[in-house]
Amino acid sequence: MTSQHSTRPVSQYTAREPEPSIPISGPVRLGAHLNSRGVDVAVLASHATAVEVCFVDTSAYHTSERRFRLRRSNHGIWTGHVPGIRAGQAYGYRVHGRWDPAQGLRHNPAKLLLDPYAKAIVRAPELHPALFSHVVDADLKPGADLKPDQRDSVDVTALGVVVEDQCTEINRPNTSWDQTVIYEAHVVGLTKNLPGIPPELRGTYAGAAHPVTINHLKTLGVTAIEFLPIHAKMTEPFLTAQGKENYWGYNTLNFFTPEPSYAMAASQNAGPQAILDEVKGMVKLLHEAGIEVLLDVVYNHTCEAGSDGPTLSWRGLDNSMYYRHDAQHPGRLIDTTGCGNSLDFRRLPVIQLTLDSLRYWVENIGVDGFRFDLAVTLGREGDSFNHMHPLYVAMATDPVLSQVKLINEPWDLGHGGWRTGQFPAPTADWNDRFRDTLRSFWVTEPAAIIHGGQGGDQRDLATRIAGSADLFGHGRIPGGRGVYSSINFITAHDGFTMHDLVAYNYKHNEANGENNRDGTENNRSWNHGVEGPTANARILSARRQTMRNLFASLIFSVGTPMITAGDEMMKTQDGNNNAYSQNGEVSWIDWDLDEDQRNMLETVSYLLRLRRDHRTFRPTNFYTGGHIDGDTIPDLTWLDHDGQTMPDYKWFDPHVRLLQALRSGFGQDADALVVVNGHPDSRVIALPQGRGTPFHLEWCSSWKTPRYTTTTYTPGAITRVPPLSFTLFFANPR
């Protein structure tokens, strides 16, 4: 298939003598920084023989360019001052040097390069042969000899824009970790279909902070919104060839610039500063509503792909410094990300770039934290992972970054890439063990039992409910990294939605154009009897109860819960578990809710209110099983169906799938009793003695909506819990 890329004519590169720049008189700061006389520029290109900063003016009919020679400074940095430059000026770099791809050197002055420190961009890259530093064929494939391409990329590449350095007054919610509930969302998909928002704001930064959006977030009870990447991005050529785009945005073009296409059309038309203002305005309005803003960030790789990919920025500036290469074959990239390249975090400039970018988003934009995609790559020193990597030491000791929320996706695709629980404080980790355990207990094991098979025992379930101390309770600090270092989740952007987890046995990714080969096969899902949509009332009821079991387990487990946007309303992606290229109805939240969806939303909101209002669900430390500060009951007691302390042998018995967990409110809050019945039939239980005060039935997952009952039971009372259910009781202190 021939790639659907631009073939419009572009000019050949013409070398000419650049104008001289003036030496910088003040401190050197990477990027472009305005002052009263003009602009200071500094860029890293350690293997270059010459570097030019190029100021570009474009119109529909003509592109003009002024080139200025920079001076080599210390540590491979090139600097210069150019008078008369003002905010709004487009610019890039041309880098001269050795062309030797076999040695990892890809200098080609025909390619105008985006400043890695640009704070704004104008024009998205246009997929065109001129974007490649090497000669490519009609399908954008390289020739065997990797000759340098002499076409000028100025008309098809992204340009940086000089902007004013602005101070931003930021009033943060500063939500404590124990109160934090994270809501993972895409800027576009969150509001593209949301009624009550003006059409021009839907699917934009402004729409994400519209009062209608904020009302939903506040009513639901989340405290932080974690946006999928909003760094400027570029779609991969193979997606462009299919007429698709990288909707999720895990293909970064620049680490400082917000993605322009997520701004309102009016902001895009007004220019880069208006886009920046819209992003800052979004953060400010969310802060005013008490909602923190977290960003999913992708520092592990860039959009330049493998060695046959385009040359947009880093590759042309200093390919052998920015990217990991095979030491024996320097022309070969090492890829631990599955995206063609990996940034080399053994290099101080890569660490500095990452830290500078993070600080910029905190101090200038106002964000409250980050989730690091494929974070193991950020902690690699060669093939090994160092949990005290210099990047993490720097973040932990940085006066700015140590004060925001830092979350790891604790794996990558390289050797030894699974590292959940092994990152340092004060960071938190996505807890995939929690996800897998809860899915197994509530979804796949009941399916196996109903079909004559056998489930697992309860040990791992209890460990996850109690905060995963096996993963987060160790280390040099007493108490380990702490109970809120576990980011508990059932679903995320990649994988099935909560609805699809209980409606599909198999992924259905045909719409992605990869013959259903993409996306994981390890879904731990169960369709409850019919694949996909059904009118069978029994199956639909069972699916909804399983979802309520999962939500309750997520919300009341110790740790920090994360909910995927739309799950609270039973969002479906029609079985697509890898909708990264689906910028459409498959990915956007459908806000036209039926009664069952409204009921689920009410239930999730109610459960989150219970978590917020009861300190019992938000302990300070890991449980000990002992009496804390003279309390008359242990901080946590595991009980069997008779209300007696769980005997050891029952923990190992796969036929025992019923447990009670009594959590102390320490005499200040109500004690909470959770009864988990993992059997496909109802079971008789005896409630524990507790403090001797009555137990109030608060909620059961068999209920379609919260009931606000007055039902109470005396300690030791006999009752029956429904099949496959999660039941919650409260007992008030004396």
Locate each region found by the language model.
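Carbohydrate-interacting/catalytic domains
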Residues: 1-183, 188, 205, 539-548, ...
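Beta-sheet entry/capping signal
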Residues: 42, 180-181, 223-226, 290-292, ...
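Conserved, mostly hydrophobic/aromatic
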Residues: 43, 93, 185, 227, ...
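Short, flexible loop/turn elements at secondary-structure junctions
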Residues: 45-47, 72-74, 84-86, 97, ...
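Short catalytic/ligand-binding loop motif for oxyanion handling, primarily in non-cytosolic enzymes
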Residues: 100-104, 191-193, 233-237, 301-304, ...
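Substrate-binding/active-site clefts of carbohydrate-active enzymes
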Residues: 186-367, 374-400, 405, 417, ...
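Glycine- and acidic
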Residues: 340-343, 372-377, 528-540, 585-592
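Conserved alpha/beta catalytic core and glycan-binding cleft of carbohydrate-active enzymes
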Residues: 366, 381, 387-565, 569-570, ...
